[in-house]
Amino acid sequence: GVVVVVTAVAAVLAYTLYRPASKAAPIPVATGTSSTVPTGAEPGPGVVSVTPGVLRDPVHADVQRVLQAYFDAINNRRYDEWRSVVTSTMSSQKPRQEFLDGYESTRDGSILVYRVDRALDGSLRVLLAFHSTQSLADAPAGHRSGCLVWQVVYPMSWDPRDAEWKVDVGPAATSPQVSAC
């Protein structure tokens, strides 16, 4: 009797804590482990997708929502929207004009979150890949190409003031793997 009641309570609690919000849009889930985009269609759709493994993580919806806003802000050159989903440390390192100049011709797409790990300090490490197109003049030094594939780890920190995760700075984000499309 007691075991059945405890199991039932645990099941209801787990369902309540981990069920998706009833009015939330469905999370795009990638069926493969990489994205291929036909030549000429780069960078691909601007939708942030997650792998099935990430979908099982309790924070997947928050991570997807924040990253979607992050990439939408870059693609639409909306600095204030970008600032709303990054930490104050990150936004202080990239003032408005630097953001606008740096992303002037950038379009990001084919965004896939592979993994979400928790760091010892409680922050997240989000492994993702995406494609970017940009003018050659705007391409990063050492990677002068109009189309790049990025594999990077974005740190995310909890912002208690806004009660949400935010993209952060840190050593995890400083060593992306970049190659031409």
Residue ranges and their predicted role:
Residues E42-E104:
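Core segments of small alpha/beta cavity-forming domains
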Residues V5, T36, V48-V50, V113:
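Intrinsically disordered, low-complexity, compositionally biased regions/tails
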Residues L13-T16, Q68, Q97, D101, ...:
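Intrinsically disordered, low-complexity segments enriched in small/polar residues
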Residues A8, V12, G32-T33, P45:
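N-terminal functional modules and adjacent low-complexity/disordered segments of proteins
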Residues Y79-L127, T133-D138:
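Short solvent-exposed beta->alpha transition segments
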Residues P28-A41:
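Extracellular mucin-like PTS domains
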Residues G1-V2, V9-P26, D121-C181:
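Exposed beta-sheet edge and beta->alpha loop/turn motif
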